[in-house]
Design a protein with these regions (language model features):
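Substrate-binding cleft and catalytic face of glycoside hydrolase catalytic domains
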Residues: 10-178
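Conserved, mostly hydrophobic/aromatic
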Residues: 6, 64, 116, 189, ...
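Single conserved hydrophobic/aromatic residue that forms the stacking wall/gate
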Residues: 1-5, 9
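Noncatalytic carbohydrate-binding groove/subsite architecture in carbohydrate-active enzymes
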Residues: 92, 132-239, 247-248
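C-terminal beta-strand-rich structural cap/linker in extracellular carbohydrate-active enzymes
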Residues: 356-368
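Aromatic/acidic polysaccharide-binding cleft in carbohydrate-active enzymes
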Residues: 213-293, 310-313
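Carbohydrate-binding surface patches
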Residues: 300-301, 311-348, 359
């Protein structure tokens, strides 16, 4: 890609999530089993125009992941979108059909939905849209309801990612779900970063399930935990996690929000967060955050189809990842310390010295 972030993967919610303006459902009518009242108007008004503009700027099609935060309130044991609750057993089939309808609505309008998760953060009871599953329940939902519905609608070309929650429990979840019956249904494991690094968990997943893709489906800096003023620290957190994940087998990193307002919203439960761009609504100005430049070191230079290659380092003060594509190698070097650190980049019999400046990130491109 000649310009921009090179960010071609996007995740969109099935119905509302915390970053929606308010709760909404395409069809919240319990009596409407055939979805006669299903309305895509909200998505058409707020989401599709931005996706279309992004594709026009990119000059190609984005790859879109769909994820539900909650089934319609009437389908749940607690009768509301928020505060967890479970999907009632009598609605498992209808909910699977609802998800298929969402995929069809996007695709019928020309948008390239290629990925699907079954539930955002299935172990989290949130003050916003949420729903709880056990690993066994997600397995049954996938095997007996979602996959058959996808097959009925000729949608089995979509990649299904299980889990979609923090890294530290991803291995046990995958162990429960993936077996001889479900292996062909599961393209990979999606994960978030909110409980810490847990790079070892990704290593175990890669070793146990070498043919499954590892995909980070959500990451953002919550202003409830981190300061908006810590622009550099927030950006470094991203780079540290991306490098650690890539080195353990991650193939896609999906940032949660590309653009938010100056408060880190809108968010209907005030769960404000950082983003690569913040839009100042008073001045009508787009403010580029440090996150943008740090993410660009990966998304702009490491192109789709590049293959990760092995690296080693003499000190843990430097973090590095490297990829090869055709006749070039791209490496990204991160120094989060307060000191400049010397380093040598060696490839076969060729060696080049450099200084990694304090609090810096650098990308190198080596023609081979």
């Amino acid at each position: 890609m000649s310009r921009g972030l090179g960010d071609v993967y996007k995740r969109q919610p099935i119905d509302s999530c915390d970053f929606s303006l308010s709760h909404y459902e395409a069809d919240g009518d319990e009596a409407d089993a055939s979805f006669e009242s299903f309305s895509f108007a909200r998505v058409e008004k707020y989401i599709l125009p931005m996706l279309a503009d992004a594709e026009a700027a990119y000059g190609g099609r984005l790859e879109i992941m769909l994820s539900p935060w909650s089934p319609p309130a009437y389908m749940k044991t607690n009768g509301e979108r928020n505060h967890g609750g479970k999907l009632k057993a009598c609605y498992w089939k209808r909910w699977a059909e609802y998800i298929c309808r969402y995929v069809e609505e996007y695709r019928s309008r020309g948008f390239n939905v290629t990925m699907l998760t079954l539930q955002n953060e299935p172990k989290a009871v949130q003050t916003w849209d949420s729903c709880i599953y056990t690993a066994q329940e997600e397995k049954i939902f996938l095997r007996d309801y979602v996959w058959p519905s996808l097959a009925e609608h000729n949608l089995t070309d979509i990649d299904i990612y299980i889990w979609d929650h923090n890294k530290e429990r991803a291995f046990e979840w995958a162990e429960t779900i993936i077996d001889a019956e479900t292996d062909h249904m599961v393209a990979g494991i999606a994960f978030h970063w909110y409980s810490g690094d847990h790079f070892e968990a990704l290593r175990m997943l890669r070793e146990r399930f070498p043919k499954k893709k590892l995909l980070l489906s959500e990451a953002c800096i919550e202003f409830s935990k981190y300061s908006a003023e810590d622009n550099l620290a927030n950006a470094q957190k991203y780079a540290h996690d991306i490098i650690g994940n890539l080195n353990e087998g991650m193939s896609v990193f999906l940032d949660w929000n590309l653009v938010l307002d100056e408060l880190g919203g809108p968010n209907h439960v005030k769960n404000f967060c950082d983003a690569p761009y913040l839009f100042d609504t008073a001045r009508k100005q787009l403010v580029e955050r440090e996150l943008q430049s740090y993410i660009k070191h990966f998304s702009h230079y490491i192109e789709t189809g590049a293959v990760r290659i092995g690296v080693s380092r003499y000190t843990d003060k430097l973090e590095i990842t490297a990829f090869q594509e055709n006749s070039k190698i791209v490496f990204v070097l991160l120094n989060r310390t307060q000191e400049a650190i010397p380093a040598f980049i060696r490839l076969n019999d060729t060696c080049a010295g450099l200084i990694a400046a304090s609090n810096s990130i650098a990308t190198g491109v080596v023609n081979i």
